[in-house]
Amino acid sequence: MVDDRLRLTSLVARQYTIRGQIIELRNKSLHYVQKDPDKATALTAKLAQWWNDVEDFHDTEDDQHASAYHRAVLTILKHESIISLNRPTLAASRQGHAYDAALQQCIGSARAIITTLHKAIKPRHQREPTSDALALLWPSCTWAVWISTFILFHAASSHHVSDGIVSRFVELGLHCEQG
């Protein structure tokens, strides 16, 4: 068991281990990846277990060590990992159940990233004192907004999401970029 004072750090470290495994899996040939779907399923399970541990952390008194900033970062990390895990499936083909499942996962994560960042980056007069720290992380969030917007445009082009929804999220993403 991890010391309660280090639990947040442990959660972040575990997430980056999972993220490294996703990168290792997805940087291989698509032919190899498609022959080993069990590894992707195992990573999906590890990511889900990690997120359950994050939610358990938020539900306990240990959460006093986590600010809104930490919650936003953990949420963004979760959804970036989901997109990283599913993105190669989207690039491979536009047919089949695997594509549809990956696209829906990515749409949900794209929406969550933009919504989370938009709520975290508000006009200065509405911020809580700890949310100023998110500004330090912001340059690394640019990719998250970009890929989220790209996924939503891709989904709209194949009629999986309405143009109105995409427009709304693109506007929120632009507000985040203007921070």
Where are these regions (language model features)?
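Extended, leucine-rich alpha-helical cores of fungal transcription factors
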Residues: M1-Q49, D62-V170
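Helix-capping and short linker residues that terminate individual alpha-solenoid repeat units
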Residues: W51-E55, D59, H118-K119, Q178
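Eukaryote-biased recognition of C-terminal alpha-helical segments
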Residues: L172-G179
